[in-house]
Amino acid sequence: MLRVGLTGGLGSGKSTVAGFLRELGAEVIEADALGRALMEPGQAVYGEIVRVFGPDVVDPDGRLNRKRLADLAFKGGRLQDLNTIVHPAAIAAQRSWMEEVFKRNPAAVAVVESALIFEVERDARLRGEQESVLVDWRRRFDRVVVVTAPEALKIARYAARVSPAGAGREAAAADARVRLKHQIPDAEKAARADYVLENTADQAALRAQTVELWQRLKA
């Protein structure tokens, strides 16, 4: 089985690439969807978030208010508190998923789509976890693919996705800038990657790059 990490900054188009790879035959798991599942009531991550951040992050229906939690993390200076809770559980779940894929199909191309493949190791080191195998991307993946795009284009894409009707796009763009500050720049990610896809044109061009990538992964 080939273990592939697919990453890129907010608004880069990595989710689109993940969709193309799934169509081509890859097994794909999305870190965002996995993170949402881990934050559901009854999950250990949910309980720890409520313990650390307090009941104000819980809506009347018992679910986490993800916007309030994100504001505390990104604007309130508590991103490391959140990452300390979520990242280890998310990576462990990704590893379990890969093990399940291998049992089903030892020849599979298993793709983890995550914005923070490099950042989780950086953040672990900031917490003093110098030798953690769990977060070492070199050991987690056989290949790493980075999707890049100009920052202005990333921000515009994010704002359009968050506010498709147009209202609130300025606030969404400001939010994107805050989030991007916490992500490793494209140039640094690209220097570490095995493959780089440049998402500066239309989806047809990005799909063509993805097809070429798929052929290399399967070679």
Task: Specify the residue positions occupied by each region the protein language model found.
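C-terminal accessory "lid"/substrate-recognition subdomains
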Residues: 102-105, 177, 181, 185-191, ...
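An amphipathic alpha-helix signature
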Residues: 46-50, 151-159, 173, 177
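ATP-dependent small-molecule kinase phosphotransfer cores
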Residues: 36-110
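ATP-dependent NMP and nucleoside kinases share a basic, alpha-helical "lid"
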Residues: 95-104, 110-160
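Phosphate-binding beta-loop-alpha motif at adenosine-nucleotide cofactor sites
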Residues: 29-30, 193-205
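N-terminal polybasic phosphate/anion-binding patch
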Residues: 31-40, 55, 150, 160, ...
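Glycine-rich phosphate-binding loop of ATP-dependent small-molecule kinases
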Residues: 1-64, 104, 215-219
